[in-house]
A protein has these predicted regions:
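A short, structured loop/turn motif at beta-sheet edges
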Residues: 111-115, 141, 165-167
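A short acidic-to-branched-hydrophobic micro-motif
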Residues: 92-121
Length: 205
């Protein structure tokens, strides 16, 4: 399953933010000297905790909407979910109609906090031009809702992108279809609102 250019840009932006946060924590931290035995114990405990976290990554599948949430004339079918797209905490999937002419990509990144999610959204906004020709505008979906609709840069298909955050989750919804036939705004709003509800339920603040 292909992850959208917009979602990838958000991942890169979030990575930079997390890197700066970690670096800042290390450079500004002070601690009293500890005995070598205590340090070794702390290191061992940290390593064990890290190994445990890596062995049991979080499954965010329940944050996704279901195919039955998509109210359309045709039946949409969900593809298999992708855990941790591009190596970042979260989940992604796609929904398509029977002949594959309409596809909805749904990518949710779970960040450390709402501020990091907002930064990921800002990074994604700068990459919108790589996916769709159009002027972004506000959308009353989640926090910082932004939408843009038009044809893809090569003119081969219509693309509508909806970006928003909900708590510490950042979501990219991309609606692809035939060229010059963008999906109706109310359809985008309906899917977006259902995705907000699913995140609120599965990832409480």
């Amino acid at each position: 399953m292909k992850t959208s250019v917009v979602a990838v840009a958000a991942v890169l932006g979030a990575s930079a933010l997390v890197g700066m946060t970690v670096a800042g924590c290390h450079s500004g931290s002070t601690s009293s000297p500890a005995s070598s035995g205590s340090a070794a114990s702390t290191t061992a405990s940290s390593s064990a905790a890290s190994s445990s976290a890596q062995a049991q990554p979080a499954d965010y599948t329940e944050l996704l909407i279901k195919a039955t949430d998509i109210n359309a004339p045709e039946v949409f079918t969900a593809g298999p979910p992708m855990q941790n797209p591009n190596g970042k905490a979260g989940v992604a999937t796609s929904f398509s109609n029977p002949d594959g002419t309409h596809v909805i990509g749904d990518t949710i990144l779970v960040l450390p906090d709402p501020s990091a999610a907002a930064s990921a959204l800002d990074a994604a906004k700068t990459a919108l031009g790589g996916s769709v020709n159009g002027t972004p505008g506000p959308a009353d979906i989640g926090t910082g809702g932004t939408t843009v609709s038009g044809n893809s840069p090569d003119g081969s298909k219509s693309v509508t992108v909806l970006l928003f955050t909900q708590g510490r989750a950042f979501t990219t919804l991309e609606f692809d279809g035939p060229a010059n036939a963008a999906v109706p705004p109310d359809f985008v709003t309906d899917v977006g609102q259902k995705q907000v509800t699913a995140i609120k339920t599965g990832l409480p603040d």
